[in-house]
Amino acid sequence: MDVQPLLKKLGEGKTLTVDEAYRLARGILLGELGEVEVAAALTAMSVRGETGEEVLGFVKMAREAAVRVPLEVDAIDTAGTGGDGAGTINLSTAAAIVAAAAGAKVLKHGNRSASGLFGSADFMEAVGYNLDLPPEKAARLVATVGFAFVFAPKYHPAFAKVAPVRRRLPFRTIFNVVGPLANPGCVKRQLVGVAEPRLLEVVGEALAGMGHVKALVVHGGGVDEVSTEGPTTVVEVRGFKLERYVVSPGDFGAPVTPLPRARSREEAVARALAGLRGEDREAAVAIAANAGFALYVADVVKDFRDGFELALKTIEEGAAYRKLVEAVEASR
């Protein structure tokens, strides 16, 4: 395909429309562009800052190229862009498990860590989850167990075409934002954490354009999670409406608590498991905070306070850890 007009437009600092971004993403993911062209496009967007329309165009193509999970239930996903360098445990994955134990249907989509301590796939693999889950089984587990994890490389094989270029670029690209939004089950409800405040509206606009029923984009004072250390900025998406506001731990009934951090993968796994068992208070509170937001997105609860209370109760009563064990066993 002839992308020269699009590259010229990007080189001039101009933004792409949704359709133009879709066509560029199509050329990249189908392997029709050379590495120099791909690098030029990704660099131009990264330097200028990706727009909601550009992210939406790329997500549309990514979903089109994905192996589809044939969901028959209204499911949610919890994911973050990563890259915050905060060294926290994988809260979005643990929160997804708690949300499932508390009544939400969850299709968790994730990958190994590219730069941080460990990603969602690293955690799920560490606890014995089968990462080679076929799409039909994933859909069945969401309906019956309430939780399934799908490994991004298995469901987005086209992303492999751009991997060599991404590895050579010394900065994050639009694909770091697209990945968390490209759930192969095409869920209509998501909790998305972003590492940069500027991405709150960018991701919110993309989610609105994707036709989401309800979604939250969060940035917790430097981390791509709901923070228990201080304020979290939220962009709530309902249909095509975006609303921005700030919440503090006390607003949803949580004590101000340090976020659980780890210095090794082993410690990160251990703290996440201890949090799910209610044995690590810092981890349990942070996991419950994020799970509470997920339960709000799933419409299991009416507000964040009810969500936090239900999530913490689910952890303290042992249901969260039992759900993890059940999910791991069902995946095999």
From Swiss-Prot:
Residues the record lists as binding Mg(2+) 2: D224, E225
Keywords in alphabetical order: Amino-acid biosynthesis, Aromatic amino acid biosynthesis, Glycosyltransferase, Magnesium, Metal-binding, Transferase, Tryptophan biosynthesis
Top EC class of this enzyme: transferase
Claim: Magnesium is one of the keywords in the record: yes
Residues holding 5-phospho-alpha-D-ribose 1-diphosphate: 80, 83-84, 88, 90-93, 108-116, 120
Obligatory cofactor(s): Mg(2+)
GO MF term list: anthranilate phosphoribosyltransferase activity; magnesium ion binding
Cross-referenced Pfam families: Glycos_trans_3N, Glycos_transf_3
Record-listed E.C. numbers: 2.4.2.18
Reactions that this protein is recorded to catalyse: N-(5-phospho-beta-D-ribosyl)anthranilate + diphosphate = 5-phospho-alpha-D-ribose 1-diphosphate + anthranilate
GO cellular component annotations of the record: cytosol
Gene Ontology process terms (BP): L-tryptophan biosynthetic process
Cofactor note as given: Binds 2 magnesium ions per monomer.
Domain of life according to the entry: Archaea
Pathway field: Amino-acid biosynthesis; L-tryptophan biosynthesis; L-tryptophan from chorismate: step 2/5
Residues that coordinate or bind anthranilate 1: G80, N111
The UniProt record lists the keyword Transmembrane helix: no
Assembly and binders: Homodimer.
Known function: Catalyzes the transfer of the phosphoribosyl group of 5-phosphorylribose-1-pyrophosphate (PRPP) to anthranilate to yield N-(5'-phosphoribosyl)-anthranilate (PRA).
Family named by the database record: Belongs to the anthranilate phosphoribosyltransferase family.
Protein name: Anthranilate phosphoribosyltransferase
Encoding gene per record: trpD
